[in-house]
């Protein structure tokens, strides 16, 4: 199993991402439920454009963040750190993605917030179940 396969398998089992954006003067982080797309190596999430992080991001922004489990046992720690690009997904592109998101999180059907994409460009996965401090790294730039 290559690094992206192992990372993707774990990410597909999680559901909350913490992501951070900045505007040159300040940084702000937010949490969201996400849908992971293995083919695009991207997260899809809902967030209001009028939120603090939505205003900072505009329609396109650099982003960094984490996805982590909640174990209390050091030997079982697993988590992802990432960097990439946050983009507001416009219609009609957002329609099929939004339907997939709604299937995973049915409560989202009543939410009017738009869909965003976090395109992952660098992923570092720490997986202590493979040995203490074991890291798997994936870089989009190396895939071209």
UniProtKB/Swiss-Prot annotation:
Origin: domain of life: Bacteria
Residues of the signal peptide: none
Family stated for the protein in its record: Belongs to the UPF0306 family.
Protein name: UPF0306 protein ESA_03544
Native source species: Cronobacter sakazakii (strain ATCC BAA-894)
Highest classification ranks of the organism: Bacteria, Pseudomonadati, Pseudomonadota, Gammaproteobacteria, Enterobacterales
């Amino acid at each position: 199993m290559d690094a992206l396969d192992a990372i993707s398998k774990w990410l597909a089992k999680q559901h909350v991402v913490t992501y951070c954006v900045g505007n040159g003067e300040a940084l702000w982080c937010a949490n969201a439920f996400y849908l992971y797309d293995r083919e695009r190596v991207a997260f899809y999430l809902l967030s209001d454009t009028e939120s603090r992080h939505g205003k900072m991001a505009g329609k396109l922004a650099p982003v960094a963040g984490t996805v982590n489990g909640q174990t209390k046992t050091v030997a079982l720690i697993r988590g992802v750190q990432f960097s990439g690009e946050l983009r507001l997904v416009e219609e009609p592109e957002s329609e099929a993605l939004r339907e997939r998101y709604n299937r995973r999180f049915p409560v989202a059907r009543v939410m009017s917030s738009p869909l965003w994409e976090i395109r992952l460009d660098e992923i570092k996965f720490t997986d202590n179940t493979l040995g203490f401090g074991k890291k798997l790294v994936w870089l989009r730039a190396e895939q071209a």
